[in-house]
Amino acid sequence: MRRGLLLLNLGTPDNADIRAVKLYLREFLTDKRVIDLPTIPRYILVYCLILPFRSPKSAQAYQSIWTEKGSPLLYHSQNLVTKLQSALKDEYKIALGMRYGTPSITTALAELKDCHSLTILPLFPQYSSAATGSAIEKTLSYLANQEIIPSIKIIRDFYQRPEYIQAQAKIMKPYIKDNFHVLFSYHGIPERHIHKSGCDTLCPQTCTPIYDKNQACYRAQCYQTSLLLAKELQLGTHQYTTAFQSRLGKTPWIKPYTDEIFAELISKGIKNIVVSCPSFVADCLETLEEIGIRAKEQWEKLGGEQFILTPCMNDHPEWIKAIHSIVNEQI
């Protein structure tokens, strides 16, 4: 009997025109785990305020990174599946499901319907309800309606796994030069999501080490990721900074904000930076456009000189080896 491996990621529009982007954003932003408001206020916010104004801007952003192969997130993810299947051979049958857009989680699970056991790996190193939680919920809701439910294993997060840290560090290392400051930029989430994760307090600066009460805290996991990467890369505490990007709306999101940390770094005399985005395993809008284009322009306008964005792990051989190890340890 065959084992199934379901890889989950967030998703991408089918193409970069306004209509496709609007459809994608509608599915994404009406998710109750993403915008955690009651249904009616959430729909009013999304349909009346966000979609009419954000869709054209987002479409323009997607167009700036779209390639002949299509969406970078999608083709990197598909390449990962192909290479991982080749590496794992008959150990697993692998399918890719996107929480929003295509290929859908439903389609991916249909591909794995003959598997007697299923390992679910959301490709989000750090746990958040809005990304990991939503993808797992969608998967389990589909499985709950099946006549035969396979044995299920869920890998909730893997930020602390040595294989992930080593793979991320190996990809970063060639880009780190003398006199360059390293910025770890993670996707942000609203502060209220932190309180919902079980944390009693929101740490004013760096988060405390992981313990029982903050083990599901996204911000704490991000800071722990930075600490582990810095150790692997042999960076001193003064050689790197952690920040959070991609905030939406006017409510407080976890800090410090990536777009506000640049001025602080410049004021300290830092002119050259290497930026890595460890919460993203594949290059996408948030890495290529938000950081690779807009953040770089901002850095240069502030007087910064060199700005290097390291690639995500994408379908790198070290990442494939890491997934193989992480998945097999769950058996």
From Swiss-Prot:
Pfam families: Ferrochelatase (PF00762). Pathway: Porphyrin-containing compound metabolism; protoheme biosynthesis; protoheme from protoporphyrin-IX: step 1/1. GO terms for biological process: heme biosynthetic process. GO terms for molecular function: ferrochelatase activity; metal ion binding. It is an enzyme of class 4 (lyase). It catalyses: heme b + 2 H(+) = protoporphyrin IX + Fe(2+). Its EC number is 4.98.1.1. It is found in: Cytoplasm. The keyword Glycosyltransferase does not apply. SUPFAM superfamilies: Chelatase. Keywords: Cytoplasm, Heme biosynthesis, Iron, Lyase, Metal-binding, Porphyrin biosynthesis. The keyword Lyase applies. InterPro entries: Ferrochelatase, Ferrochelatase_C, Ferrochelatase_N. One of its GO terms (cellular component) is cytoplasm. Fe cation binds at H187, E286. Belongs to the ferrochelatase family. Catalyzes the ferrous insertion into protoporphyrin IX. This is Ferrochelatase. It comes from Legionella pneumophila (strain Corby).
